[in-house]
C-alpha cells in the first residue's frame, strides 16, 4: 500500500486571507517503508511573505521570485500524489491551502477522506505536549527529504 507523507510551507496562516503555498514536500512510503521517491517543490506565491512565517521557514520572496507559480506545478504534483493516502500533520491547514490553490486553477479539491492527520494522534500519544511537528526534527535542515 502506498502512503505519501506531505508537508507545506506558506506565506502566512490563512488561505482565506489570500496566503499561498511556497513549498511542498512529499515522501513516498510503500508498505510502511520509505522509498527513494519524493517530490520537493518551491513555488512563487506572487505575494509577500508574512514576517512571522518567514521566521519559521526561512524562505524569502527574493529566493522564490524565479520559481514556478502553483498552476505550473499542479500537474507534476497531482501526477505524483495520484489518489493515494496522504499523511499530514495538522491536515486541515495543508489541505485548506492545497484546495485554495486547486480552486484558483479550476481543479477539484482534495478530500479529507484520503488523509490521515497525525496531529490528533500526537495529542493522544503525548497529552499536553507541544504538538508542533517541527519540534520533532533535530537535523539543522529539515528540507533534505532525500
Can you describe what each PLM-predicted range is?
Residues 56-128:
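Conserved DEDDh/DEDDy metal-dependent 3′-5′ exonuclease domain
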Residues 126-136:
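A structural motif
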Residues 1-32:
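Entry/capping segment at the start of metal-dependent catalytic domains
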Residues 3-5, 38-40, 115:
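Conserved beta-strand scaffold positions in the cores of enzyme catalytic domains, especially
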Residues 27-46:
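Short glycine-rich, Thr/Ser-proximal phosphate-binding strand/loop in the N-terminal lobe
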Residues 10-12, 120, 144:
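Short, glycine/acidic-enriched loop or turn micro-motifs at the edges of active sites
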Amino acid at each position: 500500500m502506498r502512503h505519501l507523507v506531505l508537508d507545506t510551507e506558506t506565506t502566512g496562516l490563512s488561505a482565506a486571507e489570500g496566503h499561498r503555498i511556497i513549498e511542498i514536500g512529499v515522501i513516498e512510503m510503500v508498505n510502511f517503508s520509505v522509498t527513494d521517491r519524493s517530490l520537493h517543490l518551491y513555488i512563487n506565491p506572487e505575494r509577500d511573505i508574512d514576517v512571522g512565517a518567514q521566521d519559521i521557514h526561512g524562505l524569502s520572496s527574493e529566493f522564490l521570485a524565479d520559481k514556478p507559480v502553483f498552476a505550473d506545478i499542479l500537474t507534476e504534483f497531482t501526477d505524483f500524489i495520484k489518489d493515494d493516502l496522504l499523511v499530514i500533520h495538522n491536515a486541515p491547514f495543508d489541505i485548506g491551502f492545497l484546495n485554495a490553490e486547486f480552486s484558483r486553477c479550476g481543479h477539484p479539491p482534495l478530500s479529507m477522506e484520503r488523509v490521515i492527520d497525525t496531529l490528533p494522534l500526537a495529542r493522544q500519544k503525548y497529552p499536553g505536549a507541544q504538538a508542533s511537528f517541527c519540534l520533532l526534527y533535530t537535523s539543522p535542515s529539515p528540507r533534505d527529504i532525500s
